[in-house]
Amino acid sequence: MDNQYQPKEIEAEAQAYWEQQQTFQAREDSARPKYYCLSMFPYPSGRLHMGHVRNYTIGDVVSRYKRMQGYNVLQPMGWDAFGLPAENAAMERGVPPAAWTRENIGAMREQLKGLGFGYDWSRELATCDPEYYRWEQWLFIRLYRKGLVYRDTAAVNWDPVDQTVLANEQVIEGRGWRSGALVERREIPQWFLRITDYADELLEALDELDGWPEQVRNMQRNWIGRSEGVELSFDLAGRDEQLTVFTTRPDTLYGVTYMGLAPEHPISLELAEHHPAIAELVEEARSGGTAEADLATREKRGADTGLEAIHPLTGERIPVWVANFVLMEYGSGAVMAVPAHDQRDWEFASTYGLPIRPVVHPADGTELDIAAGAFSDYGVLADSGPFSGMPSDRAFAAIAERLEAEGRGQRRVQYRLRDWGVSRQRYWGAPIPMIHCADCGPVPVPDDQLPVTLPEDVEISGGGSPLKSMPAFYQTACPQCGADAERETDTFDTFMESSWYFARFACADQDGAMLDERADHWTPVDQYIGGIEHAVLHLLYARFYHKVLRDEGLVSSDEPFTRLLTQGMVLKDGTKMSKSKGNTVDPQELVDRFGADTVRLFTMFAAPPDQSLEWSDSGVEGAYRFLRRLHGLVRDHVAAGPAPALDPQALSDTQRDLRRKVHETIAKASDDVGKRLTFNTAIAAVMELCNALGKAQDDSAAGRAVMQEGLEAAVLILAPITPHLCHHLWFQLGHTAPVVEAPWPEADKQALVRDEVELVVQVNGKLRGHVTLPADADQQQAQEAALAEHNVQRFVADKEIKKVVFVPGKLINVVAK
């Protein structure tokens, strides 16, 4: 065994062994229970960053731990390979996106292998491969034929820099999530998936996802945004049309003092032709962001249309305004404004001097101060005709019944969630498999013509997709009538590819179907790991897609991910690592200098997985020193020859104490990892154990036997975290099978039993001493020993003992006055 810890040689040896033995190649025919552990696959940017390393280290540690527990583990890896950065890189470097992407995949694959991650590389996939996205196209056509896909002209979020449409979730404070450009509003034809058909199930099933963080579930609940209310109509005076609105507060109906129209409402657009103030609002809406946080804080601006609506219950005439805080895509683009009971309505009314009429008063009789702001709570109705005096909940039902009886409204459920617009005006994405015929309209590409393959040898110059200028791609014949037709040149939103990749990993070599029975064997994913920033993007879409796959008979489970771990960010100097801040750390440089095990150990030791990790150069150096010390402990032990068999009955008190420390460490690590995945505290326990082993200068046969057991325990606990060194040390400790095949250690309950315990002694809750007693000592014995302590006597002398609190094995507290 080498005198010095040589991580480069040790890691190369272990990685070669795993590859030669196909150690991590999962097989479905195992009699062991399955465990599917998956970390969100990366975009192939070319180099791993520390966020990647943390994410994938957590996943690998969980996978290796579960393997030691006897599970048949699947841990695959692939590439979320489509997307805008490849096009941007192509423009900067003059390299086609396909070539740039595949070169990056090769580089990152080698980095991942160098970190020792136990992936089943036989299942590797890249979403830019036609054999992957052909099945996405196939499913899209099936959903089109079922009516779950439709095309519509819609107001969309247009990113003027990236020249593409963004989903609402991709607009962050009015700016594009990638480019940072101010988003504009445009009307263009789009393909949509009817995710709203699944809104109820997506919402209700969240209650069953008890393996998910509550924060993520709440984010999805809020995004789906189910609300019960009443849809009602206001006639427009002098016009043969109505304004339809949805309200969750019909109890405030008598407080309506104006109507609000979105700038993009058809009536607003009509009036804008002759009304400059309205035209200005329309233009502002088309060029401004639509994020709700943006709208909530934006200055309230509007224009009086001169139109009046007629109140459905009182007949009162109500002015109609165009208001910049009303969104066209939510509901009908019109709202009934109740400024006394809605803060945005109040701010607008205050700006323009519109009436503010309170009709709901606090139930406790508190005075309303409408001058200070809206009262938005429930309460008791006033000035509401026959409904005055009713509590809000009763008034909700009574007013809804009245509106329904008079044919002016009906109760309904509304969602904040909107259908998923999946069209992108970009090149580097999966082609949408539709053909546009002048006579037949949109026609799906026949199954036997799939995949519609993306041409890869292109030049990217910016200003839209090159597909639009490639007749060889878009010119085709209509599958129905044979006439000249054109292919769709939009490509899929890249979230389409990441919405089902987890299932494809189960059968990545299947070329005759989207999925086969292996997908049912492995899904749902038992442990999914990734960033919380994907809570309402990828994670919601993946849940929807999985339910679609279920309804198509391709999987039988209802949800894709049983447990979700959202890892914390990697920080340096208190802020997230990023190139723009110049505070990044290159993991490859650390691997080259210290070895992969050191990087893995620091990553798992510095913080619990779900909390932010603060980068520390000294922490990395400390991790390296610990591994060097562990290597030295094993080296020195092995140099003395094979250790004899352990006889627990033949141990001295000192040896028994050390053995107890070994098994306490096993028990703690098993509890920390098994229940909470807090590997950092398990590592700390192993470090303490190694300190104790290092201090044990005992060359006797029994002493060496305890040392052998202790070193084996340390190696087994660390094996998922620092697998290369533990692979090496396990063989050095005399084993012929690799540590990766060894079971997780179990604590010997007999070894944990203590003959004596040290009790903390308190007087009136303050520490006054310690006493050592037999482990089975009762309260009477503990009290006698405590009161016999000299320091305790000082604090109880001349006082009456009122009570004694005894916690067996831990403390005794004497209450004296």
From Swiss-Prot:
It catalyses: tRNA(Leu) + L-leucine + ATP = L-leucyl-tRNA(Leu) + AMP + diphosphate. Keywords: Aminoacyl-tRNA synthetase, ATP-binding, Cytoplasm, Ligase, Nucleotide-binding, Protein biosynthesis. One of its GO terms (biological process) is leucyl-tRNA aminoacylation. One of its GO terms (cellular component) is cytosol. SUPFAM superfamilies: Anticodon-binding domain of a subclass of class I aminoacyl-tRNA synthetases, Nucleotidylyl transferase, ValRS/IleRS/LeuRS editing domain. A motif ('KMSKS' region) lies at residues 576-580. ATP binds at K579. GO terms for molecular function: aminoacyl-tRNA deacylase activity; ATP binding; leucine-tRNA ligase activity. Disulfide bonds: none annotated. Gene3D superfamilies: 3.10.20.590, HUPs, Isoleucyl-tRNA Synthetase, Domain 1, Valyl/Leucyl/Isoleucyl-tRNA synthetase, editing domain. It is found in: Cytoplasm. InterPro entries: aa-tRNA-synth_I_CS, aa-tRNA-synth_Ia, Leu-tRNA-ligase, Leu_tRNA-synth_edit, M/V/L/I-tRNA-synth_anticd-bd, Methionyl/Leucyl_tRNA_Synth, Rossmann-like_a/b/a_fold, tRNAsynth_Ia_anticodon-bd. PANTHER family: LEUCINE--TRNA LIGASE, MITOCHONDRIAL (PTHR43740:SF2), LEUCYL-TRNA SYNTHETASE (PTHR43740). Belongs to the class-I aminoacyl-tRNA synthetase family. This is Leucine--tRNA ligase. The gene is leuS.
